[in-house]
């Protein structure tokens, strides 16, 4: 990235200059600008990883819920499986768990780790016991991250190129589209004013980060064992607000009224979830690579 555009190199090795008033990085988890400028910060609390594959002939419900995604908690309550029916009688099945449980102690046999997790989780085992695995195993480590900056002079990052949150509540598409919407408004406004500064292009980021933090809080509460069922039973007047949060109403301060009564139900000694950057020095947080291992064994 350079002033007024960027330098690119094609698959044929030929380099070229591309002129642009604003460079918008929507490169997904490749996060080209985030990696170039060493902006990535890993979540200090959601230190998780995932292993997944695809199965043909796995159990599928019928009727109106045939394509519904399922979340199945592991018996130790430290992790969960996703179970996502897809086309061609295929189901995506993946386990999300603490990093050390999946990869600690030099564990590199991802198939064995996945199968052990399945054996411990009857709700998953019975659904895939008669299925055929259609692919190898995909692996990603430490996958909750965010960029220190959403913009610079002449550039913006959005979607997974900005950040990724543990997908427990399937917030990824919502957050990607919202960041794109907000960034687009800032870019259009900036171009009209002749202002493509960092401040102008990233004016949307503080409010967006606040919204991510609300969803992150719900995810962390889940992993911490908090019972939203008991909470709603005790505070039926907040049922609608909790529902609003879970379905993505993350960008309105009115939803913050749930946190004080939620914390009042904590057991003695439990503290509120620390802020995103708490406890993770920036030099450590930016050293790790976001590894995605695909079935051929390559890093992507």
Predicted regions and their residues:
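C-terminal helical "tail/cap" subdomain of flavin- and related membrane-associated enzymes
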Residues: 185-300
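Short glycine/serine/threonine-biased micro-segments
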Residues: 26, 77, 92, 152, ...
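Tryptophan-centered motif/residue detector
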Residues: 22, 52, 80-82, 137, ...
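FAD/FMN-dependent oxidoreductases across multiple families
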Residues: 101-186, 192-203
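Short secondary-structure transition/capping segments
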Residues: 33-40, 94-102, 170-173, 234-253
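A general structural signal for short secondary-structure boundary/capping elements
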Residues: 68-74, 97, 117, 128-132, ...
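Predominantly flavin-linked oxidoreductase catalytic cores and closely associated redox partners
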Residues: 1-126
């Amino acid at each position: 990235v350079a002033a007024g555009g960027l330098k690119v190199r094609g698959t044929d090795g030929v380099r070229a200059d591309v002129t642009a008033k604003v460079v918008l990085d929507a490169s997904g988890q490749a996060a080209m600008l985030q990696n170039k400028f060493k902006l990535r910060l890993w979540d200090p609390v959601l230190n998780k990883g995932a292993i997944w594959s695809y199965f043909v002939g796995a159990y599928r419900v019928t009727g109106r819920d045939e394509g519904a995604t399922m979340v199945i908690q592991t018996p130790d309550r430290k992790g969960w499986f996703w179970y996502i029916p897809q086309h061609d009688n295929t189901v995506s099945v993946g386990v999300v768990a603490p990093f050390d449980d999946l990869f600690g102690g030099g564990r590199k046999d991802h198939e064995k780790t996945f199968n052990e997790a399945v054996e411990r989780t009857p709700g998953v085992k019975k659904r895939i016991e008669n299925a055929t695995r259609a692919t190898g195993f995909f692996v990603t480590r430490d996958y909750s991250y965010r960029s220190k900056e959403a913009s610079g002079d002449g550039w913006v990052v959005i979607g997974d190129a900005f950040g990724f949150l543990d997908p427990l509540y399937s917030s990824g598409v919502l957050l990607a589209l919202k960041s794109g919407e907000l960034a687009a408004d800032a870019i259009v406004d900036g171009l009209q004013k002749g202002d493509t500064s960092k401040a102008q292009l990233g004016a949307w980021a503080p409010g967006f980060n606040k919204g991510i933090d609300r969803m992150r809080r719900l995810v962390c509460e889940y992993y911490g064992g908090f019972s939203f069922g008991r909470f709603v039973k005790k505070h039926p007047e907040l049922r609608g607000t909790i529902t609003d949060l879970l379905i993505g109403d993350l960008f309105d301060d009115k939803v913050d009224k749930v946190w004080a009564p939620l914390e009042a139900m904590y057991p003695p000694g439990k503290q509120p979830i620390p802020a995103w950057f708490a406890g993770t020095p920036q030099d450590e947080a930016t050293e790790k690579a976001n590894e995605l291992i695909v079935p051929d064994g390559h890093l992507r």
